[in-house]
Amino acid sequence: MRPETKQSKNERVIAVFGGSAPTEGSTGYEEARLVGRLLAQAGFTVMNGGYMGTMEAVSRGAKEAGGHTLGITNAAPFWRDLQPNPWIDREEKASDLLSRLRRLTLADGFLVLKGSVGTLTELALTWSLMQTQAIPRVPFVLLGSHWQRVLDVFVTNSYARPPDLAMIQVADTPEEAVELLTQGGKGR
């Protein structure tokens, strides 16, 4: 993450991408909440899109564990009526969706949860920016075996080379995901 956007030079920020649909009590929400708690306990600041669903859940988990949160919201007209979730400490308003996506790629690591088209966009953009060295190669973890099927499409169709695939790790549990991020992406 750029030094000028950090609260302190020691702040380690993990961008968490995931769906906006999960609601409190659902499996997706509660898993994201656990992820937030574990990230905060590991000393990370949690950054996300700042709104509802897994963004709210991961922020809530981090705050419940005494951690810090950063929400990158959108000032564009389509988004203007949305309020950031109540678990966000710091809000940064991007002028449009592309600026928001770019800002979300400025992190010390990435964790991708279950989501929809927006999550897939964030995953692909981050992966491409790392692959082209537009952003530094940092830990990049996908949570859940369903992501392996997505990656397999790239392998089967020769869309991604082995070095490209080596940038991404798939974790089976929130604990494993946070451990991989803590280890700097080194693991299995």
Regions found by a protein language model. Name each.
Residues 19-22, 75-77, 115-119:
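Short glycine-rich anion-binding loops that position phosphate/pyrophosphate groups of nucleotides
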Residues 1-70:
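Glycine-rich beta-alpha loop segments
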Residues 30, 53-114:
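Acidic/glycine-enriched connector segments
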Residues 24, 78-81, 147-152:
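Short, charged/polar "capping" segments at the starts of alpha-helices
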